Amino acid sequence: MNNKKNIILLGATGSIGESSLRLLRKNKEKFNLVGVSAHNNAELLSKIVNEFDVPNVVLSDPKNVKSYYGKNELYVGQSSLIELAKIKCDVVISGLIGTSGLYPAYAAISAGNNLAIANKETLVSAGKIFMKKSFEKKVKILPVDSEHSAIFQCLEKNNISNVDFVTLTASGGPFLN
C-alpha cells in the first residue's frame, strides 16, 4: 500500500526548491515528487527530473529549452505552469518569486490542492481572494518561508484578537547572499 504524499514543486531550482528537495531526499519513503518546474535553469531541472523520475515537468521561460535533457517530457510556458499546479496532489509547494506565483498558486487551490507557499507577495496582493477560495475548496494554505511561517506558528497558538498588526521582513530569495 502506498501512503506517500504526492508533491508538486514550483520553482525547484531556487532557494525554496533546493530546501524542499533536501527534505524530499531525506524522506523518500514519505513523498513522491509528481510535478516540478523551473523558470530558466533547464540543466538543473533536468538533473532533478532524472533523480526523482518526475512525470510532469515545466520550464516557464522557453529561452533555455534546448538545455533540457531530462528523461521525461518537458512542457514550456506560463500556461503550462498553471496547468501543472492544477494536477491533483496532496501539496503544491510554491517557491515562485513575487507575483509570478499568483496564478499558479490560485490554480492549485482551485483544483483542491493544499498550498505550501513561500512568497509573501501572493497573499499581500490577493490574500482575501485566496482565503475565500481555500475556505470554499476546504484546502490549507501553509506558509513555508521563515518569516511568515514563524508568524503563522505564533498566531496559530495564540489569540489572534490580541494582534494589532504584523510586520514582515525579507531575508531570503535575492537577499540571501
Predicted regions and their residues:
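Short, polar loop motifs at secondary-structure junctions
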Residues: N41, S60-K66
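ADP-ribose/adenylate-binding Rossmann-like module
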Residues: G95-L96, A108-V124
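N-terminal Rossmann-like dinucleotide-binding module
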Residues: M1-V54
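A short helix->loop->beta-strand "cap" motif at the edges of active sites that frequently abuts
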Residues: D53-P55, K71-E73, A111-N114, E136-V139
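Short acidic-hydrophobic, aromatic-tinged amphipathic segments that line or gate anion-handling sites
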Residues: V58-S60, E73-S80
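Beta-loop-alpha module in the N-terminal Rossmann-like domain of NAD(P)-dependent dehydrogenases
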Residues: V76-A107
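Residue-level signal for inorganic ion chemistry
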Residues: T13, V49, V57, V92, ...
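Rossmann-like NAD(P)H-binding beta-loop-alpha module
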Residues: A107, G127-N177
